[in-house]
C-alpha cells in the first residue's frame, strides 16, 4: 500500500471518528416565539426549549441572550431553568425573573450563565410561564450596569411539552 493511500485512509478514519464524537444539535420544532432542540452528546441527550428576547434594554448593547428549560434524562435532571444574558454576571447583584406578580431569583451564576438552585422554584416558575404572556429577566454586568430582557411566552407551553 502506498504512503498516499495510507494517509488517505488515516484521514478518513480521523474524520469519521471525529464526527461520531461531535455533539449534534437538532431543531425539533418552532412554536411561535419558542423552539425545541435536542443536543446529542456521547453521554446522553439534552432536550430543551429556548427563546430569545423580544425586547432588550439598553438597546445599544446587542447581546446574545437566551432563556432555556432543559431536560437531561441520563442525569435525572428535569425542568432546569437557565439563562444567558450574553455577558458575565456581576456577583454582587441579583438576577431575577418577573412575570405578573411573580418574581424568581437565579441563585447560581457562572460566567455568562445563571440557574435557579431549587427545583421546586423552577417548577413554580414553569407554571407561571405556562400561564403568562411575557417574562422579564433583570441582571447586572461586571461593571454594575443593569440589563433587562423581555421574553414572549407565546409558544412556551408547546415547546416545553415537546422538550419534555
Range-by-range predicted roles:
Residues 3, 21-22:
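N-terminal secretory targeting signals
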Residues 1-9:
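Bacterial N-terminal signal peptides that target proteins for export
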Residues 22-164:
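A generic "folded-domain core" signal
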Residues 13-14:
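Short, linear, compositionally biased motifs with a strong N-terminal bias
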Residues 17-18:
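N-terminal signal peptide c-region/cleavage motif recognized by signal peptidases
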